[in-house]
């Protein structure tokens, strides 16, 4: 994929508007607010703008956080201040934190592969979120931007073909782990997926920034 195609893919993600979707406010926050960690954004050497992936991740973190909070309040009838009380709920198929993978080493290619594979799993798990929380107006944007981010990450690989799509058996296993159980268990699995996706995105942002500092060509 060439730079023009990548730019158009990113642009399409930023302008996608779902009816009733508060994307405009997310765009406003993207342009005006700082990153949650307080770190300054990296810049593109030619334009002085943040790298494409960083803008995309920032948007996604904002929207996934909003979606997680909305689902928690609406589905569990609890204030968002009590969200930490659900931290013990886990989903077996969610990817491990990047700090526990090859991203903790200095192998850039292996780390990019881990990120791409993890995002593919979350892309699939978002189907479960859609099935259990169909009224969400944010979810279509989150799903679309996750797909675009996978493309941006693969663009940085030397051999993107190494990361294959999930097989039919893998897809069946992942969805089977979250689609069964009681209504309560399915709701808590949605919450856990959104929580862990947010954490994975933050880990991804940190890993990509480390790579960017090691090589100016990583934009």
UniProtKB/Swiss-Prot annotation:
Matching Pfam families: IL6
- Inducing factors: by LPS.
Tissue expression profile of the protein: Expressed in spleen, gill and gastrointestinal tract, ovary and brain. Highest expression in ovary.
Assembly mode:
Component of a hexamer of two molecules each of IL6, IL6R and IL6ST; first binds to IL6R to associate with the signaling subunit IL6ST.
UniProt protein name: Interleukin-6
- GO CC term (a single one): extracellular space
Signal peptide span per the entry? 1-20
* Location relative to the cell: Secreted
Q: What is the protein's species of origin?
A: Oncorhynchus mykiss (Rainbow trout)
- Tell me, in a sentence or two, what this protein's role is: Cytokine with a wide variety of biological functions in immunity, tissue regeneration, and metabolism. Binds to IL6R, then the complex associates to the signaling subunit IL6ST/gp130 to trigger the intracellular IL6-signaling pathway. The interaction with the membrane-bound IL6R and IL6ST stimulates 'classic signaling', whereas the binding of IL6 and soluble IL6R to IL6ST stimulates 'trans-signaling'. Alternatively, 'cluster signaling' occurs when membrane-bound IL6:IL6R complexes on transmitter cells activate IL6ST receptors on neighboring receiver cells.
Disulfide bonding pattern of the chain: 103-111
User: Superkingdom of the source?
Assistant: Eukaryota
User: Which InterPro entries does the entry mention?
Assistant: 4_helix_cytokine-like_core, IL-6-like, IL-6/GCSF/MGF
One BP annotation, GO: regulation of glucagon secretion
* The keyword Signal belongs to this UniProt entry's keyword annotation: yes
Q: Name one GO molecular function term.
A: growth factor activity
Q: Which family does it belong to?
A: Belongs to the IL-6 superfamily.
Keyword terms of this UniProt record: Acute phase, Cytokine, Disulfide bond, Growth factor, Secreted, Signal
Work out whether the entry's keyword set contains Endoplasmic reticulum. Answer: no
């Amino acid at each position: 994929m060439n730079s023009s195609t990548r730019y158009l893919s990113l642009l399409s993600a930023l302008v996608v508007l779902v009816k009733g979707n508060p994307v405009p406010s997310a765009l406003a926050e993207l342009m005006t607010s700082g990153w949650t960690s307080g770190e300054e954004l990296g810049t593109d050497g030619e334009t002085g703008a943040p790298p494409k992936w960083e803008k995309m991740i920032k948007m996604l973190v904002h929207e996934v956080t909003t979606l997680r909070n909305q689902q928690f309040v609406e589905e569990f009838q609890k204030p968002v201040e009590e969200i930490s009380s659900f931290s013990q709920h886990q989903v077996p198929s969610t990817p491990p934190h990047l700090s526990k993978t090859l991203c903790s080493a200095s192998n850039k290619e292996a780390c990019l592969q881990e990120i791409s594979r993890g995002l593919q799993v979350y892309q699939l798990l978002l189907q479960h979120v859609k099935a259990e929380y169909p009224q969400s107006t944010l979810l279509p944007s989150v799903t679309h931007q996750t797909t675009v981010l996978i493309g941006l990450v693969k663009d940085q690989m030397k051999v993107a073909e190494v990361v294959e799509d999930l097989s039919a058996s893998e897809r069946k296993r992942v969805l089977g782990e979250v689609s069964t159980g009681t209504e309560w268990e399915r709701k808590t699995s949605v919450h856990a997926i959104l929580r862990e996706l947010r954490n994975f995105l933050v880990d991804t942002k940190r890993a990509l920034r480390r790579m960017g500092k090691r090589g100016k060509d990583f934009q």
